[in-house]
Amino acid sequence: SPALMRLMNYSIGLYDQFKAEGANNIGWHKVGSLRLASSPNRLKALQRHVSRARGLGLDVGTISAKEALDIAPFINPDGIEGAVHIPDDGWMDPNGIALEFAKRARELGVAIETNCRVTGIGRDDAGAVTHVETDKGTVQTTTVINAAGQWAPRLSAMVGAITPMVPMMHQYVTTRHIPGHELPEQTPVVRDPDNLFYLREEVGGFLVGGFELEPKTWAADGVAWDFTQQLLPEDWELFEPVMEGALRRIPLIEQAEVIKLINGPDAMTPDGHYCLGPVPGVPGFFVAAGMSLNGIAGAGGVGKVMAEWIIDGEPSLDLHEMNIRRFGANYSNTDFVAEKAREVYHYYYHQHYPADETLWARNHRRSPLYDQLAELGAEFGEKNGWERVNFFRPGEPSRQAADDQHQWGWGRAPYHDLIREECLAAREHVALFDMTSFGKFEVSGPGALGLLQRVACNNIDRPDGSLVYTQFLNAHGGIESDLTVCRLAGDRFRIIT
């Protein structure tokens, strides 16, 4: 994600600045990183990522297996097709950077109250925030930022809002150093997605974590307020595939004495992206949560864009994929959210392709025409919980798009000819489109036309009954929405998007 890259890049610069100003206690270890490609397709994907990252100004490059071995001599080079090297990457101590942020905030006049639980959020008749109630008293304010981590859904519920995320069990193991094979402090972070693990140095030994194949949610209905400074029971059976992958790539680990397997919950959103921005319908209430295992890496950038959102009314980056408004009422279904979060976690290290479809938590929402479409041989994809037709295979049974799409990679998918025939039929004859899953809005009143003419990039002033395909633009000329406007009559318009 270009947006996530930019947020992380800003964070790195900020942490470098802190160290340059003498904050050596933040635990920022700028040791670089290696992301290994243990398959040809993984190497192709990494090369694509490198091209995009360089376009954003990141210092990153693709290196050979031999060069990777020179940087991290403890890895087994068998099967490595290449790697990505990021010299400015690293790892840091969460406690150290949190304390540094708190220290600098206090120096700017911020009051920090610990062990203080929010019990309610007051709102006026228009729904805007007026105050926060706590077990230590009431705070008058018109701006609230919900940065409550895995407790964020419970806090948002106080204003009737949805912030969908579910804590996932996330484990890592630490080992003692191996005499004669102590890892130096400058050991780079190593990630091997094909083997499911990541690794870094910890007091001369190994710290190994990863993404289990059968992820488990925890406290999906809400995390208890008093769950603090606690861990979950270790689960070696769950962690086994990660450990096996690490041992394949780094056999030396087998000689290390295990200190402990750490199991700590971390909140994951249904699509793996942050939840940021103002909550629709609750003026003054903002969310900065759902970090989905990228919290520390993006923290500095998230703080910057949240400040911009509050002060300027918009962030300096295009954050549509992270905007909290992307989640509608259907994400109030806890089971649906939990299954989507599990899918994101399960596929976190899998290779992704343009034609990929989500496979879990399907049939959440169906059109009234679903059965008729299925009878016509529809192949269904998923969009925002809706089962939507990707294309038809006339005369064949209906099906859901599945893992078989991975075999096409970045190449031409075999269904292109089917879609071509559908396009020709729509152009030359008559076609019926199921618009159930699209959003529909009505804009009406004396100022309706003027408003639409201002925000749309096409001419909306057409005769009654006209359809205008257009985009809504922001103040910078960027696209906010792709839509069709139907002029129902005079000053009444229907928007379909």
What are these regions (language model features)?
Residues S1-I71, D194-L199, G204-G205, R342-P354, ...:
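Dinucleotide-binding Rossmann-like beta1-alpha1 core, especially the glycine-rich loop
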Residues T119-G122, I259, G277, C486:
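Conserved positions in beta-strands of structured domains
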Residues H29-S33, M168-H170, L261, G490:
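Short Gly/Ser/Thr- and Asp/Glu-enriched loop/turn motifs at secondary-structure junctions
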Residues G120-E234, P241-I250, D335-Y347, Y353-E357, ...:
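Flavin-dependent oxidoreductases
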Residues D194, V203, W225-R365:
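C-terminal catalytic lobe of FAD-dependent flavoproteins
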Residues I324, G328-T497:
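Glycine/proline-enriched, intrinsically flexible loops and inter-domain linkers
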Residues V84-T143, W151:
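Helical element adjacent to the flavin cofactor pocket in flavoenzyme catalytic cores
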Residues R6-N9, L36-A45, V84-E107, E113, ...:
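Short beta-strand to alpha-helix junction loop
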